[in-house]
Amino acid sequence: MIGSFLTRGLLMVFGYAYPAYECFKTVELNKPEIQQLQFWCQYWIIVAALTIFERIGDALVSWLPMYSEAKLAFFIYLWFPKTKGTTYVYDSFFRPYIAKHENEIDRNLVKVKTRAKDMAMIYLQKAINQGQTKFFEILQYITEQSTPKSKAEEKKETTIPKLDDPILKVKENEVTK
């Protein structure tokens, strides 16, 4: 448990914080080197893909011994200058796969965007309809409260106690005693 907690903390530092800082330094140079920018872009693309697959992978294989440590080592391998892990993983695996499936990915993204837009419009329309309904209910309530009542309506609202009312019987008994 403590090992897993420590490993997650180290992963945050060495997998995200340190690379983000190095990327920041590269971007902020007066004349940033294109190779360095390309390296960090590739790194963050790989990290994004790993983060997506990590949800499934963690559930399936996190029980393996040294899984967290291996994940930490892989992140360090990616950015460590002597290993050039990002370049190797990107050029050997990521780029060929994406290039092969790029058209299919683009088509699916267009479908997802269209569905999301359609769903957003449906929910927006429902919210507008519900808002209108509530607005008119409030308006009706306000107009009912502000219109003066006739004397006949006021008499209807005034309740005349019944003779068999238990409260009246108690009071009647008190008076007769």
Swiss-Prot record:
Gene that this sequence comes from: HVA22G
User: Pfam families from the entry?
Assistant: TB2_DP1_HVA22 (PF03134)
Return the InterPro entries for the record.
Answer: TB2_DP1_HVA22
Q: What PANTHER family does UniProt report for this protein, alphabetically? A: HVA22-LIKE PROTEIN G-RELATED, HVA22-LIKE PROTEINS
The text of the family note is:
Belongs to the DP1 family.
**Protein name (record):** Putative HVA22-like protein g
Q: Where is the composition biased (Basic and acidic residues)?
A: 150-165
Q: Where do the record's region annotations for Disordered lie?
A: 145-165
